[in-house]
């Protein structure tokens, strides 16, 4: 998920699914750390996590096209486009008042410095506190 090492400047970035039905905008700082999670769903989908506070996420269109999938604890709300099947964002259990946006689904301007770090999602409960300090400034929840 994403942490902010120290950048002040905020940028508005567009994102969405492959077919274009789901579109959103996010506001992010100039420096971000994105996590590559090793849990089963992230590993199989190639998801790169960027946690964005709900106040910095704006769904422009496609909400009616989203299909929700929950597993294990049932807390995380995985949202897939019902047309193309892409998960461009979802509501993570670590930050239920935020969104995890897939870096691969965002148009990132050249001014953004992106660092990708590994996260041991196979042992999520043991490592979840390492996700604290995201763009939301919140701590993780179960």
Indicate residue ranges for each PLM-predicted region.
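A short Gly-Trp-Pro
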Residues: 1-16, 21-142
